[in-house]
């Protein structure tokens, strides 16, 4: 149950800008090693990233059990942040999160972006269609879709909050203000912003003929 809650917390932290603003500093490094694992959010607790675990309390799980299990999950995820381990046995790769799967999660390549949200297990990603395997033909390119050129920890931790405030000042309606805050990162009023969905759709359109375009993915809009 903890891992199920973690999956939805982690997915929301990528698909909702309000939570992404807290989570982004974990992904801002263009290098991938064990030190990446300790680049943790400063503002997550303040913006309610604990909410996906609250239903477990309502179901009767003691809070101390939830905290303990969440701690075990974070310990497990520490060793995933490495390029030194290529692949593990196939059965393990199928069931569990591994360095290979988590490299994909940290990659900004269009084919990899916003994939593999699971903490310990990969079954949730396979079930909900967010799984992607690492390809030997395309090395992972780590970092953000638009990287920030600074090592200042304050700017790294708060740059997305600043960008959100700037976008809110330019909002022309409550709908725009809502989407700038709670929509996907990169959302723009014209629908052509660099969201993960648009980036993936453009990539798919470049490699598949129009007639073979997957129906489950919305084609990119033309300017």
What are the functions of these language-model segments?
Residues 1-142:
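Membrane-embedded catalytic scaffold of the fatty acid hydroxylase/desaturase
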Residues 138-223:
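Cytosolic-facing loops and C-terminal tails of multi-pass membrane proteins
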